[in-house]
């Protein structure tokens, strides 16, 4: 399995935008759709009424989660999204764009504040819980609100899927500071990240998804 560092992945995505004219929005749409198709094919092919919970951050990983939620909803899945709002300021960029799309498509999205009781109740009987909180840009110690959210997700008896990398895990070193999402499956976007292969006990089974990177870029890795 080919792996990349977080820096190399950012370079590939930047090259896709600047050299091949692929908009970042297109890459995110492709990633979210690929994840939705994988979930449908592997877990929901016979019963789409099982509950799916997607918990998003306000960065790129959260955007992937919102896109995935929209596609699952359009396919008739019982899906609910939660999102941790920015500590300061407001939503920006692709996350804001996909929140608007979620609103117009009637996808259920709730913000997570200090009271986690609603999230606890939701994940308690969920069939699948998806971690779309923190991505490859994360380094260091997990902030309190994210830490508490991760603990709630880990308490669920559901199938647990991490988008790109489990939240709390360093994408390069595979280290964590204690608060880390423990996945049964990790859906690596484009390429598996180096840290995943160093933390297989946390990442579970790694599945690499196509996010629409040009063949010319894929061949350089």
Swiss-Prot record:
The Swiss-Prot or TrEMBL record lists the needed cofactor(s) as: K(+)
Q: Which residues bind (6S)-NADPHX?
A: 60-64, 135-141, 146, 164
Q: Which residues bind K(+)?
A: 61, 131, 167
GO CC annotations on file: P-body
Identify one Pfam family in the record.
YjeF_N
Q: What class of enzyme is it?
A: isomerase
Gene Ontology biological process: deadenylation-independent decapping of nuclear-transcribed mRNA; P-body assembly
Tell me the Gene3D superfamilies matching this sequence.
Answer: YjeF N-terminal domain
Catalyzed reactions per annotation: (6R)-NADHX = (6S)-NADHX; (6R)-NADPHX = (6S)-NADPHX
Extract the NCBIfam families matched here. yjeF_nterm
User: Belongs to which family?
Assistant: Belongs to the NnrE/AIBP family.
Name listed for the protein in its UniProt record: NAD(P)H-hydrate epimerase
The uppermost taxa in this organism's lineage are: Bacteria, Pseudomonadati, Elusimicrobiota, Elusimicrobia, Elusimicrobiales
């Amino acid at each position: 399995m080919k792996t990349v560092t977080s820096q190399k992945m950012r370079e590939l995505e930047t090259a896709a935008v600047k050299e091949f004219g692929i908009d970042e929005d297109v890459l995110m749409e492709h990633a979210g759709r690929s994840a939705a198709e994988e979930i449908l094919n592997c877990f929901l092919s016979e019963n789409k009424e099982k509950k799916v919970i997607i918990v998003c951050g306000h960065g790129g990983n959260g955007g992937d989660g919102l896109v995935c939620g929209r596609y699952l909803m359009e396919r008739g899945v019982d899906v609910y999204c939660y999102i941790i709002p920015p500590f300061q300021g407001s939503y920006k960029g692709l996350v804001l764009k996909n929140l608007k799309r979620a609103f117009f498509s009637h996808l259920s999205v709730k913000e997570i504040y200090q009271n986690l009781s609603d999230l606890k109740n939701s994940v308690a009987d969920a069939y699948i819980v998806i971690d779309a909180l923190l991505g490859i840009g994360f380094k260091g110690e997990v902030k309190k609100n994210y830490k508490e959210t991760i603990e709630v997700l880990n308490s669920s008896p559901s199938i647990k899927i991490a988008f790109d990398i489990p939240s709390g895990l360093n994408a390069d070193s595979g280290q964590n500071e204690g608060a880390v999402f423990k996945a049964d499956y990790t859906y690596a976007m484009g390429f598996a990240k180096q840290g995943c292969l160093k933390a297989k006990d946390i990442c579970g089974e790694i599945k690499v998804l196509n996010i629409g990177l040009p063949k010319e870029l894929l061949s350089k890795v």
